[in-house]
């Protein structure tokens, strides 16, 4: 046969390329125009190369095995067919070699069906594995760590945000309290605000050593009274006497007792009223000695019938304690007899007391009558002219201001107080932080004593002042983020213990309870005492036992926690992100966008301002935005996620009465006896304890339930089960793809060069 002879000629040729050239021709002959391509018939029949693979002769097989063969010499389509067939023989994937080496069509068809069935099962199981991976499921690992837990930051606030004696000097606050008094009077059905008191005077026409000067009698509801000094025309000495007073002596004594108890804020009717009687008796005994003329400079004068008239001179010009809501002017003394001084305490009615042995802290400016009746007065503005004020008729406030206060239609006292607290926050927002701090309690006034781990605290250094819109000045213990405080043991003796003093006599009329507000939080978190705080009443030891739980959450795609500490529009600068802060920031941004001003209860960004408390339009806009966020679709406008790292403190509260009767010690800086100090601190003081119940804490850590490693393991198992494919088998398919892509690119490049050469030849022939 000719093909056998051609193969044997290879043995007689020293150059293999020459033999290939003789058998197959020049491999580059197809690039020449005159050279004819080898046809398929010539390739398989004339040259006989294709018959070699079907020959079973040993000689032929041996020559084929030992002979060198270059598949690049084959045409492109035959080269691809040869390459794929070679891959079927060599691949490590199960089933594919059986298809390629099948001896007949039926055998090959069976293996094709089996292979396709396995591929379908692989697809279904692989889809299940991928779905499980894409669900991004997570698990929570709970660990109980027996280690020293870091002590949290403790923020302490007085339940009374501002001192009544100082806050009432702010005009907007005074107007707010006046509107509050009017609303409370209407809600309680009080009809006595415009009723004049019955004034009865004694008629000592000839003063005698045993005759007492005119004493004020009357009835009055002082639940909303607020005093301020004012000028008025008065009658002093015999000018103000009346025969009717002697007839009503017994009846009016009872009314005087009731009235004075209300004014002086007396709680203990048996003990403190006796002291008040002693004060009255002493005051009027002095008059018995001094009343030797028709008019004494130090005696009390009457102004109920003359307060509408302008004084005519020095003899009838008095300063009276005036209440705008009731038009009461009492007591009245001549102008030169009042003394400008400082008082120890002032209550919500602006009534002040001097020489209070149990009082401690800031002294308030006041003006005192000879009878020791004192009224808060800072001297910045002159006293009101009562006759001018009353000639204008019943005082009418600006309707827009009353509308902004929001008291219209309210009949529930609790709701009115709540609205008044909000109005106070709005009014205080007009002041700077320094002014608000000045009107509120100082850290030395609130915290008398302090200890941590059994050692005394440095109150000035260990407490940081923070101004809260709802509670005024608050003080944070353990505020230094670079210092890590820990309790050396569990129990109250090794935690934080504080003796606090609230000075209930200087409370605002909107403050409903006496005590302090305590917030337990991380150093990096804003305290939010109005939301997360705990109230500790006066007269008790309030023990707060702590348990710490640390959370570590996974960010996207496993969760939606906030990983970076804060969001871009977070309004609480220098503090870490929290869910409550996020909602408040979202609400504030909404208010700023739609109302052009911010809610005074929350901070505002730079270049923004708070809404005016007296602006009814702004207040309505704020209320509308609050209703929007509290409605059905409010949660869709503010989406706030949990932080990725969070410390949660579980608190257990237990109280006990304090101080005990056996605690006969000088508490704080009280100057009275031990019994007096105990009684005073029971009404104005409290002991607060914050400690860990156990020196261990829980760690809750989220981790991925099905990670990428699990995906590879399960997916590889499915490939091996159904197709016998491993990672190396996958690499075989990758290389097959790369090789075929390279052959296609090489073939296309050869065609491109050929066309380019033909084009150049045509151009060259055309030039001749």
From Swiss-Prot:
Compositional bias annotation for Basic and acidic residues: 189-200
GO CC annotations, alphabetized: axon; membrane; neuron projection membrane; plasma membrane
UniProt keyword Glycoprotein present: yes
Tissue occurrence: Expressed in AVM, ALM, PVM and PLM touch neurons.
Extracellular side, ranges: 131-718
Sequence ranges on the Cytoplasmic membrane side: 1-109, 740-768
Transmembrane segments: 110-130, 719-739
Chain positions carrying an annotated carbohydrate: 335, 356, 480, 484, 503, 671
Pfam families in UniProt: ASC, Mec-4_10_cyt
GO biological process: detection of mechanical stimulus involved in sensory perception of touch; mechanosensory behavior; negative regulation of turning behavior involved in mating; positive regulation of detection of mechanical stimulus involved in sensory perception of touch; positive regulation of mechanosensory behavior; potassium ion transport; response to mechanical stimulus; sodium ion transmembrane transport
Topology in membrane: Multi-pass membrane protein
Keyword Ion transport appears in the UniProt entry: yes
Subcellular localization, as worded in the UniProt entry: Membrane; Cell projection, Axon
Main location class: membrane
Chain segments carrying region Disordered: 184-219
Alphabetical UniProt keywords: Cell projection, Glycoprotein, Ion channel, Ion transport, Membrane, Neurodegeneration, Potassium, Potassium transport, Sodium, Sodium channel, Sodium transport, Transmembrane, Transmembrane helix, Transport
Top-level taxon in the UniProt lineage: Eukaryota
Any GO MF annotation of the entry: ligand-gated sodium channel activity
Function: Subunit of an amiloride-sensitive cation channel (degenerin channel complex) permeable for sodium, potassium, lithium and N-methylglucamine, and required for mechanosensory transduction (touch sensitivity). Negatively regulates the turning step of male mating behavior.
Subunit structure: Component of a non-voltage-gated amiloride-sensitive cation channel complex (also called the degenerin channel complex) composed of at least the mec-2, mec-4, mec-6 and mec-10 subunits; the complex mediates mechanotransduction in touch cells. Interacts with mec-2, mec-6 and mec-10.
Family: Belongs to the amiloride-sensitive sodium channel (TC 1.A.6) family.
Misc: Mutations in mec-4 results in the degeneration of a small set of neurons which typically swell to several times their normal diameter before they disappear, presumably due to lysis.
Protein name: Degenerin mec-4
Organism encoding this protein: Caenorhabditis elegans
């Amino acid at each position: 046969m000719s093909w056998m002879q051609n193969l044997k000629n290879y043995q007689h040729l020293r150059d293999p390329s020459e033999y290939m050239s003789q058998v197959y021709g020049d491999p580059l002959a197809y690039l020449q125009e005159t050279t004819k391509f080898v046809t398929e018939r010539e390739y398989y029949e004339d040259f006989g190369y294709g018959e070699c693979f079907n020959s079973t002769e040993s000689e032929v097989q041996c020559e084929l095995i030992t002979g060198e063969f270059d598949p690049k010499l084959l045409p492109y389509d035959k080269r691809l067919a040869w390459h794929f067939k070679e891959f079927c023989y060599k691949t490590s994937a199960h089933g594919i070699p059986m298809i390629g080496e099948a001896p007949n069509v039926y055998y090959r068809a069976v293996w094709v069906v089996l292979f396709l069935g396995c591929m379908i099962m692989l697809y279904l199981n692989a889809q299940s594995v991928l779905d499980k991976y894409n669900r991004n499921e997570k698990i929570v690992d709970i660990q109980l760590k027996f280690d020293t837990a870091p002590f949290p930051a403790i923020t302490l606030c007085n339940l009374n945000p501002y001192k009544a004696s100082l806050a009432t000097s702010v005009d907007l606050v005074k107007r707010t309290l006046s509107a509050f008094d009017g609303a409370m009077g209407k809600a309680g059905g009080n009809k006595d605000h415009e009723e004049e008191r019955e004034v009865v005077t004694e008629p000592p026409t000839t003063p005698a050593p045993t005759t007492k000067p005119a004493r004020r009698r009357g009835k009055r509801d002082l639940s909303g009274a607020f005093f301020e000094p004012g000028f008025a025309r008065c009658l002093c000495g015999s000018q103000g006497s009346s025969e009717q007073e002697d007839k009503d002596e017994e009846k009016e004594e009872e009314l005087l007792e009731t009235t004075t108890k209300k004014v002086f804020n007396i709680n203990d009717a048996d003990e403190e009223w006796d002291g008040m009687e002693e004060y009255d008796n002493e005051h009027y005994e002095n008059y018995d000695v001094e009343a030797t003329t028709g008019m004494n400079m130090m005696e009390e004068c009457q102004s109920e019938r003359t307060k509408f008239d302008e004084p005519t001179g020095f003899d009838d010009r008095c300063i009276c304690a005036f209440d705008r809501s009731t038009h009461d002017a009492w007591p009245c003394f001549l102008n030169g007899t009042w003394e400008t001084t400082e008082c120890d305490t002032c209550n919500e009615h602006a009534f002040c007391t001097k020489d209070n042995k149990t009082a401690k802290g800031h002294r308030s400016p006041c003006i005192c009558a000879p009878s020791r009746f004192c009224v808060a007065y800072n001297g910045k503005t002159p006293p009101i002219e009562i006759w001018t004020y009353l000639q204008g008729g019943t005082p009418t406030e600006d309707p827009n201001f009353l509308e902004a206060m929001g008291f219209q239609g309210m009949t529930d006292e609790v709701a009115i107080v709540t609205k008044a607290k909000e109005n106070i926050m709005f009014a205080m927002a007009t002041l700077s932080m320094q002014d608000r701090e000045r009107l509120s309690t100082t850290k030395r006034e609130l915290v008398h004593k302090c200890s941590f781990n059994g050692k005394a605290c440095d109150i000035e250094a260990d407490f940081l002042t923070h101004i809260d819109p709802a509670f005024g000045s608050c003080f944070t213990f353990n505020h230094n983020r670079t210092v890590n405080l820990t309790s050396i043991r569990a129990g109250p003796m090794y935690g934080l213990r504080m003796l606090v003093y609230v000075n209930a006599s200087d409370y605002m009329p909107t403050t409903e309870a006496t005590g302090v507000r305590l917030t337990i939080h991380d150093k990096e978190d804003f305290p939010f005492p109005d939301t997360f705080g705990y109230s500790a009443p006066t007269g008790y030891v309030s023990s707060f036992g702590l348990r710490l739980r640390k959370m570590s959450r996974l960010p996207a795609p496993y969760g939606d926690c906030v990983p970076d500490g804060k969001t871009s529009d977070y309004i609480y600068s220098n503090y870490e992100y929290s869910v409550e802060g996020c909602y408040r920031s979202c609400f504030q941004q909404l208010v700023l966008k739609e109302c052009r001003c911010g809610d005074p209860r929350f901070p505002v960004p730079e270049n923004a301002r708070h809404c005016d408390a007296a602006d009814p339009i702004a207040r309505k806009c704020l209320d509308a935005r609050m209703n929007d966020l509290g409605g059905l679709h409010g949660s869709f406008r503010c989406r706030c996620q949990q932080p990725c790292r969070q410390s949660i403190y579980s608190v257990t509260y237990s109280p006990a009465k304090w101080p005990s009767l056996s605690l006969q010690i000088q508490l704080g800086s009280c100057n009275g006896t031990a019994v007096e100090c105990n009684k005073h601190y029971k009404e104005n003081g409290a002991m607060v304890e914050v400690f860990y119940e156990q020196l261990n804490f829980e760690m809750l850590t989220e981790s991925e339930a099905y990670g990428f490693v699990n995906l590879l393991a399960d997916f590889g198992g499915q490939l091996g089960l159904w197709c016998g494919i491993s990672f190396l088998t996958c690499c075989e398919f990758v290389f097959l793809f790369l090789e075929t892509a390279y052959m296609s690119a090489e073939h296309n490049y050869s065609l491109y060069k050929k066309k380019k050469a033909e084009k150049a030849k045509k151009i060259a022939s055309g030039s001749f």
